[in-house]
Amino acid sequence: MRKSVIAGNWKMHMTCAEAKSYLEEFIPLIKNIRDDRKVVIAPPFTAISTFSKHSDFDYLDISSQNIHWEDEGAFTAEISPKMLIEHGVSYAIVGHSEPRKYFSESDEQINKRAVFAQCSGLTPIVCVGETLEQRERGEADRVITRQVEQGLENTDPSNLIVAYEPIWAIGTGKTCEAKDANNICSLIRKLIGFDDVIIQYGGSVKPNNIDEIMSMSDIDGVLVGGASLDPNSFARIANYQ
């Protein structure tokens, strides 16, 4: 049985002091979380050490928001797996639509990050998703297929999470219909060819829609943005029914 992974991506939010206060409020709210799920938070790099000092790793894991494909070198503004592992990080988000958009990350670069994350002992959370224009032109399946085939080449599906995040639903308040999201997640599972791969949905996930999203057969978790910044909202998402 696939374990549910409920992940929060804080993006460029929260200082170390704010992260500490958040954890003090959040951890008691998830202490009785069910054994069939895992909670992961991806704080800014500066707050990762706060997590490693103050979080309880039995039910809360740390993710980075990106990762480089080398352990060291002249790569300004990048961060390596060994730097992250030293602080208790066990997951790494790669291929999020924001680096794809703002820094022109290619599927080839995303693949290098994902492969090296696995080689270093981390579990990559690889994001895929189509734009509104691509969706309206009926190209969603083709775009997702390309991103999966190129971005996941030579990865180990037994140590992998794929997050389907329709770009038009991220931070907009618009949520992909649960059945439509499930159909894309089913496509991703078939493309990977491994039934036990964990597939998340991301895009305006909130307490008022989490139960419907998680009732879908091919959705194994969520990657949450804005709603993960509020400890009560994120706890409700983590404790979905």
From Swiss-Prot:
- One GO BP: gluconeogenesis
Q: Name one Pfam family in it.
A: TIM
Keywords of this entry: Cytoplasm, Gluconeogenesis, Glycolysis, Isomerase
Query: Which residues bind substrate per the record?
Result: 9-11, 171, 204, 225-226
Give its E.C. classification number.
5.3.1.1
| Family membership noted in the UniProt record | Belongs to the triosephosphate isomerase family.
Q: Which residues cross the membrane?
A: none
Q: Which PROSITE patterns match?
A: TIM_1 (PS00171), TIM_2 (PS51440)
- Kindly provide the name given to this protein in its UniProt entry: Triosephosphate isomerase
Principal subcellular localisation of the protein: cytoplasm
- Top EC class for this record: isomerase
Q: Cross-referenced InterPro entries, in alphabetical order?
A: Aldolase_TIM, TIM_sf, TrioseP_Isoase_bac/euk, Triosephosphate_isomerase, Triosephosphate_isomerase_AS
The record's subcellular location field reads:
Cytoplasm
GO cellular component: a single term: cytosol
For this UniProt entry, the molecular function terms from Gene Ontology, in alphabetical order, are: triose-phosphate isomerase activity
The gene behind this protein is tpiA
- Annotated catalytic residues: 96, 165
Which HAMAP family does the entry link to? Answer: TIM_B
Sum up the protein's function in the record's words: Involved in the gluconeogenesis. Catalyzes stereospecifically the conversion of dihydroxyacetone phosphate (DHAP) to D-glyceraldehyde-3-phosphate (G3P).
